């Protein structure tokens, strides 16, 4: 069955990125480079946005209720998707974003510099009375600087 909408979809994600001064920020971005095609013929066409990566590691984490990490940078550029529960990310510019199941974050705050309080990267932790289960896809690539919303 072929049921194709004429307008390509968009998917929102939060990009945690570092500016040229070493300060981390978050920007709400859109994945919007979709084409309609079969992922594996003869399957019917669907909207696809393929982002080629040189390699990746998939990590699952379970953050307990009340968990708060210390300020830190993401170890690699990485896609983070909550599967259940809620979590927050606070960047050095003071912005705090809370995310739940199905929302997406791209953690790319490498190369930050300590602020006046000694903070680098971001602070994150659980929100609410349930653990937060995250799926993380760590990319084996060099992080960018001063380039919000680089994935489209």
How should these model regions be labeled?
Residues 106-114, 118-144:
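A short hydrophobic beta-strand segment most commonly corresponding to one strand
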């Amino acid at each position: 069955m072929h049921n194709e909408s004429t307008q390509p979809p968009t998917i929102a994600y939060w990009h945690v990125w570092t500016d040229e001064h070493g300060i981390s920020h978050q920007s709400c971005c859109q994945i919007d480079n979709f084409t309609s095609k079969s992922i594996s013929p003869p399957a019917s066409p669907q909207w696809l946005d393929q982002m080629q990566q040189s390699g990746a590691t998939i990590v699952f984490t379970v953050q307990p209720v009340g968990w708060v990490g210390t300020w830190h940078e993401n170890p690699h550029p990485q896609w983070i998707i909550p599967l259940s529960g809620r979590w927050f990310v606070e960047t050095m510019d003071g912005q705090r974003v809370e995310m739940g199941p199905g929302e997406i974050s791209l953690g790319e705050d490498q190369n930050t510099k300590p602020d006046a309080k000694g903070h680098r990267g971001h602070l994150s932790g659980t929100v609410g009375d349930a653990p937060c289960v995250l799926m993380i896809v760590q990319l084996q690539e060099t992080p960018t600087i001063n380039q919000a919303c680089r994935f489209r």
